[in-house]
Amino acid sequence: MANIPGYTYGSAAPSPVTMRELEELKQAVLFTAEDEKYLKMAGEVLKDQIEEVLDLWYGFVGSHPHLVYYFSGPDGKPDANYLAAVRKRFGQWILDTCHRPYDQAWLNYQHEIGLRHHRTKKNQTDRVQSVP
């Protein structure tokens, strides 16, 4: 497991979404074993380019005030430490999406990520004071 602060893959609480529901969702969006195969191939291409992908994404977020707002401190300015902490986990998420099996551990962590994007758990992982 990657040594990234706040990266809790494999130890996240159980997702309320069941594996059966995940399989039904995959069917509904036509996600197949072939998609998984190509994600693994993409992961091989991306593994040495993660920083470039993150630079592009952070440039996009940073160019939209309504997006960077969610990384702002009480002073209204982007919190560089918060952005850096999230960046490390986002890079690992890209690799996980490409290489990890879509099993219960994966599902649990995706649910955890969702909670961290909602006022339920936003700001807690990095102990920051940002907008909910």
Q: How would you label these PLM feature ranges?
A:
Residues 2-60:
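Intrinsically disordered, low-complexity terminal regulatory regions
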Residues 25, 50-132:
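Heme-based O2/NO sensor domains and their adjacent alpha-helical segments
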